[in-house]
């Protein structure tokens, strides 16, 4: 008798549970779409590629780009610009709407005659001095500026020059590390094979150190010849910069681009007038 009563109880319970389930299902089907639970969607962040120039401005004439040339951010000779003056230069660029470029962006601007902003500039430093990290880098971060340091391969970690860790930190924060050869020798005095090795070894060093395609080289002391230009192309660089004065343009040759030397003694206003004269 007890088993019979227990069986009846279990049967009634099952029927009640089934009825509840049907009620919940019907209620969810009748719920307005806005109230129905949706599977959680994952947000996908799409990072705009550096080589996407679809929104860039087409230039009416072949693009011209001021490539600024600094060395040490200190005082003492014509290659050294004091920190206070350097900051005045960066402030002027920001106040006047200039966009600073990476080497890749500079290459695209010069080869496609398109630019990401009405006013663009490429900031470069030769040799890779410690003060580029201690004094220039904080200013660049303060004003949101990109820059490029042409580092001498053999000088990494040596006195007054950047360490690998310093360069890697900067590389994560808008500063590109590019080639100034291995030994900083005047290339026009070397054999074609020596020139090739200086450039190839430097590119390999920085490619491996920063997991990048090192794309631009600065010729030591601005010395170069036709063999230099040939070697720069053969070793895989996209651009080479010289110390020839003026704004860079494609008609100079992508391996013989001019630069704008920034000397000490320039106030922000004087610097600005100098840059504006390059248009």
Where in the sequence are the language-model features?
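Positively charged n-region of N-terminal signal peptides that target proteins for export
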Residues: 1-4
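Hydrophobic helical h-region of N-terminal Sec-dependent signal peptides
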Residues: 6-14
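C-terminal motif of bacterial Sec signal peptides marking the signal peptidase cleavage site
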Residues: 15-19
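Bacterial signal peptide processing site
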Residues: 21-23
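C-terminal active-site subregion of NodB/CE4 polysaccharide deacetylases
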Residues: 29-124, 130-131, 189-279
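Short, well-structured secondary-structure segments
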Residues: 67-69, 78, 99-103, 141, ...
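Acidic (Asp/Glu)-rich catalytic clusters
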Residues: 137-145, 162-179, 233-234, 248
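Substrate-binding clefts and substrate-entry loops adjacent to catalytic sites
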Residues: 178-193
């Amino acid at each position: 008798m007890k088993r019979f009563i227990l069986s009846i109880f279990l049967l009634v319970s099952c029927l009640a549970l089934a009825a509840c389930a049907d009620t919940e299902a019907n209620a969810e089907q009748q719920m307005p779409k806005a109230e129905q639970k949706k599977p959680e969607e994952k947000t996908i962040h799409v990072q705009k590629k550096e080589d996407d120039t679809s929104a860039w401005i087409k230039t009416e004439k072949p693009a011209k780009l001021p490539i600024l040339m600094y060395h040490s951010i200190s005082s003492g000779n014509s290659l050294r610009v004091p920190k206070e003056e350097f900051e005045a230069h960066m402030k002027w660029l920001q106040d006047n709407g200039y966009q600073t470029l990476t080497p890749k962006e500079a290459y695209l601007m010069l080869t496609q005659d398109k630019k990401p902003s009405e006013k663009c500039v490429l900031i470069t430093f030769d040799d890779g001095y410690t003060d580029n990290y201690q004094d220039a880098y904080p200013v660049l971060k303060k004003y949101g500026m990109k820059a490029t340091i042409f580092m001498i391969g053999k000088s990494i970690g040596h006195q007054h020059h950047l360490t690998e860790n310093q360069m890697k930190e900067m590389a994560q924060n808008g500063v590109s590390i590019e080639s100034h050869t291995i030994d900083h020798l005047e290339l026009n005095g070397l054999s074609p094979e020596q020139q090739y090795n200086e450039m190839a070894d430097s590119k390999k060093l920085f490619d491996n150190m920063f997991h990048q395609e090192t794309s631009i080289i600065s010729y030591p002391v601005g010395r170069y010849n036709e063999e230099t230009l040939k070697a720069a192309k053969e070793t895989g660089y996209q651009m080479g910069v010289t110390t020839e004065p003026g704004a860079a343009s494609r008609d100079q040759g992508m391996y013989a681009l001019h630069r704008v030397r920034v000397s000490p003694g320039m106030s922000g206003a004087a610097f600005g007038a100098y840059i504006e004269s390059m248009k």
